[in-house]
Amino acid sequence: MDLAERSFGRAEQALKDGGVVRPINFIRLDGHMEWIDTDGEFNSFSFAQSIDTKRIQQRLNVALNKEGAFLSNSLSRANNYLKKLRKEDPTAGALVICIDHEHAKVVSSLLRKLGEEPTIVLSDDNKASTKISDFSQNDSKWLVAVRMVSEGVDIPRLRVGVFATNTTTELFFRQAVGRFVRLRKPDE
């Protein structure tokens, strides 16, 4: 049976049947964020703390801000993990999903400070599709994207993901996770 003819209603079944998807490990990083909101109120929260909906988005935006340490620390941890994976799989790649074009450039700059040269894919780049295709075929380490690598994009060598976006819809998250679950065929 061709893989395209298979349909799985549940991830557990796909894992049990084997050969289609691999398990995903989510590493939750905590951090302490402080900010002054638009009402002039001082806020100080970690990700472990429960807060109201309005502050949840504010906390996430602060965490992903280039001025703070959370984003650079997250990228550093992800880069170290990718290096470890590449000892066994030299073509393993990583994807950072960013907020917007400016954020993607900030993330790329942070990766360069770690000694990496990322491939950046932005929607206004007429070579974006070519860059994604090239990345899927080469052994570059990092792909930095804004909404360009979602449903329909197949890069089997992706092994590390950094969800550095403030888009919190379930559909977008599922599409992002979908970039990492597919098992590689022996010839990929």
Question: Could you say what each language-model-derived stretch is?
Answer:
Residues 70-80, 103, 130-131, 148:
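Well-ordered alpha-helical segments embedded in enzymatic catalytic cores
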Residues 99-122:
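Conserved helicase motor "Helicase C" RecA-like lobe of SF1/SF2 P-loop NTPases
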Residues 29, 33-36, 102-103, 167-169:
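Short acidic, S/G/P-rich loop/turn micro-motifs used as interaction or catalytic elements
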Residues 2-91:
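Interdomain helical connector at the RecA1-RecA2 junction of SF1/SF2 helicase-like NTPases
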